[in-house]
């Protein structure tokens, strides 16, 4: 009995501390300054670790930026410039060497598939999963790493799991209870309160530090919020500062339980992407939703898949065909404190969350941008590209014309043929001034992309 009493006392003390120091302040959007102190200590520690690594590295070794860590030393000049020597003379067998070189470079390291793996770090952040490129480890640095493991797994992980369990449980229970009320302004207010409070608690479970910029441009009711997509926690990041109606794929498991509870309290739209009827129904419901200026803004990720936060890939045009005002949002994570990217082909949702909860913290910047509308004579594809460009510039991300669906699908033959035509024009000397891809050559499907997608669980 004494052992049981001790466990009960320890558990009650733990929950009391968590509730009073973290849970209640986070529920009201307040901070006692604990996370700020933690981040200052963490920044100083990582700066010290970087200096130790630099001292231990050979003089000829220089820490490179992520952009320069590629396997291949590429010629950055335009392809047409490289082919200038081919023009004005007859074809020779050696002319194919240039294209063979480019083809081999694409096979070894293309600019697309590397966006579906974690971003390389400039310096080690004392996490075992990111020390592949860093081998100059001193005894002092090893001791600090061991202490970091103890802190992350013996203190932070139990704390974060506790907060996540409380946040998810309150979300399911709260939305289920609110869903029993008749439609009214009171129900809407309670629904927004439950969503906002629970999302804030869940963000605290990740030691989230979020910096919101340009809050005067926050998405308004009746509008559509579009953002670049890195992880499922993008939803939590945005929902901590405002409520949204979400569009997404139906899931099973824990995600499915959360979805079914949430839709009772708020008009979220869940659908089966494989069902054509569902896709048409979603488009219809979205148009009806934005027509009502009293409803929450819709949250959509037009890329349709998670990208590693170094670039923005093709936006599907479906989100830009339904009309309404688009509110672009750029999200940029700091990988030095933890990798927010979800590589769904390698990790299921539970494994991903455990990796996040055993990282140092999730630090990110969110930029709200001025609302954008479709201009006269502008089609949906052009509008989507314009919004994508604005997000890429604001977030400091690389803009790519490629479809994120290439993560799992093969390149279509029509696109290969288009590239062959472009190359042939360049060889004969009547090609375009540059090899910049025209967005019209890239297949751009029309279905809206969800906030919760059909990633592997």
UniProtKB/Swiss-Prot annotation:
Could you tell me where the Polar residues compositional bias lies? 431-444
An example GO CC term for this entry is: endoplasmic reticulum membrane
Pathway assigned in UniProt:
Glycerolipid metabolism; triacylglycerol biosynthesis; Phospholipid metabolism; CDP-diacylglycerol biosynthesis; CDP-diacylglycerol from sn-glycerol 3-phosphate: step 1/3
Q: Which InterPro entries match?
A: LPCAT1-like, Plipid/glycerol_acylTrfase
What's the record's remark on domains? The HXXXXD motif is essential for acyltransferase activity and may constitute the binding site for the phosphate moiety of the glycerol-3-phosphate.
- Role description: Converts glycerol-3-phosphate to 1-acyl-sn-glycerol-3-phosphate (lysophosphatidic acid or LPA) by incorporating an acyl moiety at the sn-1 position of the glycerol backbone. Also converts LPA into 1,2-diacyl-sn-glycerol-3-phosphate (phosphatidic acid or PA) by incorporating an acyl moiety at the sn-2 position of the glycerol backbone. Protects cells against lipotoxicity.
- This one is known as Glycerol-3-phosphate acyltransferase 3
Gene transcribed to yield this protein? Gpat3
């Amino acid at each position: 009995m004494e052992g049981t009493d001790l466990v009960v006392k320890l558990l009650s003390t733990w929950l009391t501390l968590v509730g009073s120091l973290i849970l209640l302040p986070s529920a009201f959007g307040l901070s006692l300054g604990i996370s700020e102190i933690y981040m200052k200590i963490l920044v100083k520690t990582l700066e010290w670790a970087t200096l130790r690594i630099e001292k231990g590295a050979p003089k000829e070794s220089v820490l490179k930026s992520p952009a320069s860590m590629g396997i291949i030393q590429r010629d950055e000049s335009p392809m047409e410039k490289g082919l200038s020597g081919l023009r004005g003379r007859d074809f020779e067998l050696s002319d194919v060497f240039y294209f063979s070189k480019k083809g081999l470079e694409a096979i070894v390291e293309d600019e697309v598939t590397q966006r579906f793996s974690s971003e390389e770090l400039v310096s080690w952040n004392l996490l075992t999963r990111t020390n592949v490129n860093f081998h100059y480890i001193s005894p002092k640095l090893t001791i600090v790493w061991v202490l970091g493991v103890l802190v992350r797994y013996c203190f932070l992980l139990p704390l974060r799991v506790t907060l996540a369990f409380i946040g998810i449980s309150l979300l399911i229970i709260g939305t289920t209870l609110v869903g029993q009320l008749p439609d009214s302004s009171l129900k809407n207010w309670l629904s927004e309160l439950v969503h906002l409070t629970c999302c804030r608690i869940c963000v605290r479970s990740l030691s989230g530090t979020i910096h919101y910029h340009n809050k005067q441009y926050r998405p308004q009711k009746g509008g559509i919020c579009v953002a670049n997509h890195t992880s499922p926690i993008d939803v939590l990041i945005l929902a901590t500062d405002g409520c949204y109606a979400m569009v997404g794929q139906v899931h099973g498991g824990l995600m499915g339980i959360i979805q079914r509870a949430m839709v009772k309290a708020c008009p979220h739209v869940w659908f089966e992407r494989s069902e054509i009827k569902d896709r048409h129904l979603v488009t219809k419901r979205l148009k009806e939703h934005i027509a009502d200026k009293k409803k929450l803004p819709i949250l959509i990720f037009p890329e349709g898949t998670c990208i590693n936060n170094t670039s923005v890939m093709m936006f599907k045009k479906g989100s830009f065909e339904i009309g309404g005002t688009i509110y672009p949002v750029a999200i940029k994570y700091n990988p030095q404190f933890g990798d927010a990217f979800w590589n769904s082909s390698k990790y299921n949702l539970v494994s991903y969350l455990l990796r996040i909860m055993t990282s140092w913290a999730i630090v990110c910047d969110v930029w709200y941008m001025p609302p954008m509308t479709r201009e006269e004579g502008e089609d949906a594809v052009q509008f989507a590209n314009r919004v994508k460009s604005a997000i890429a510039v604001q977030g400091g991300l690389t803009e790519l014309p490629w479809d994120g669906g290439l993560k799992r699908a093969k390149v279509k033959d029509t696109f290969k043929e288009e590239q062959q035509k472009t190359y042939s024009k360049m060889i004969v000397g009547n090609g375009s001034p540059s090899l910049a891809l025209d967005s019209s050559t890239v297949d751009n499907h029309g279905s809206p992309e969800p906030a919760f997608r059909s990633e592997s669980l």
